[in-house]
Amino acid sequence: MSELIVNVINGPNLGRLGRREPAVYGGTTHDELVALIEREAAELGLKAVVRQSDSEAQLLDWIHQAADAAEPVILNAGGLTHTSVALRDACAELSAPLIEVHISNVHAREEFRRHSYLSPIATGVIVGLGIQGYLLALRYLAEHVGT
């Protein structure tokens, strides 16, 4: 059996990890996060395809590709979580699991961050555990979707 491909998609501003609000998002850069995710995925027998874009259109394209391939998605949509019906509709097409991840505890922050268009259609939501949230999502997928 071939290894399961997991799409890890990061939205707007996540390319600035380590520089943007490190007190909220931590000091790990996006490049360091990618290496960590790829290493963890390999140890779990998964192949992580990690992407980041500040463009909503690009995120939609990647979600559509995952939907067409029936591949799971770990998604940190950043601020689009709270605003994008288009992203929600694209994610609704996924037949494989969707895990919504947020580095910070969005429920302990501003009121507008507490609403997610994605949570009602996600398989699971991991918030406030820092970058460990991505690794927990990978472990879940390895165990429940599996290799």
Curated annotation (Swiss-Prot):
Substrate binds at residues 76, 82, 89, 103-104, 113. It comes from the Bacteria. Its EC number is 4.2.1.10. Pathway: Metabolic intermediate biosynthesis; chorismate biosynthesis; chorismate from D-erythrose 4-phosphate and phosphoenolpyruvate: step 3/7. Keywords: Amino-acid biosynthesis, Aromatic amino acid biosynthesis, Lyase. It catalyses: 3-dehydroquinate = 3-dehydroshikimate + H2O. The gene is aroQ. Gene3D superfamilies: Dehydroquinase, class II. CDD domains: DHQase_II. Homododecamer. PANTHER family: CATABOLIC 3-DEHYDROQUINASE. Transmembrane segments: none annotated. This is 3-dehydroquinate dehydratase. It is an enzyme of class 4 (lyase). The record marks 20 as: Transition state stabilizer. Belongs to the type-II 3-dehydroquinase family. Catalyzes a trans-dehydration via an enolate intermediate.
